Amino acid sequence: NAMLSIYSTYPNSSVLSIKTIPISPMYCSAIGKAALAYYDDEKLAAYFKRQDLRKRTAKTIITREAFEKERERIRESGLAYDDEEYEEGLFCMAAPLFNAEGAVVACISVSGGYGRMMAKKEKVAEVLRQAKEFIEVYTESMDRFEL
């Protein structure tokens, strides 16, 4: 029902930061939506049936119908967005990581202030896609897990 981030870096810091970040609901976080987009229909229906969908901001998607449109866009582009859905002023972009069998096993994401991310959206998307490809190609043990 939720996604847990366990690693973060900050570009203007010389200190490597490893920590857990508050658990965010899947339906309103980029990493959660990246994973949900690849659930089969039965698993997705079960998620929406049991999940309490609360509006966190004016932009939060809270219906299965609205998510289905988002799901199609995610599958076409390969990227999921949190466009101020979890927190106002925050924009996140995520890509699912697949194992050899085609199952989503993890997600990677980039987050930042809305204005800053919008100014570099295409560049960030390209770098995120490159990182996704690198991780999938060079990670052999991912086939042991599935979200």
Model-inferred region functions:
Residues 88, 105-147:
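Juxtadomain coupling helices with adjacent low-complexity linkers
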Residues 91-95:
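Short hydrophobic beta-strand micro-motif common in sensory/regulatory domains
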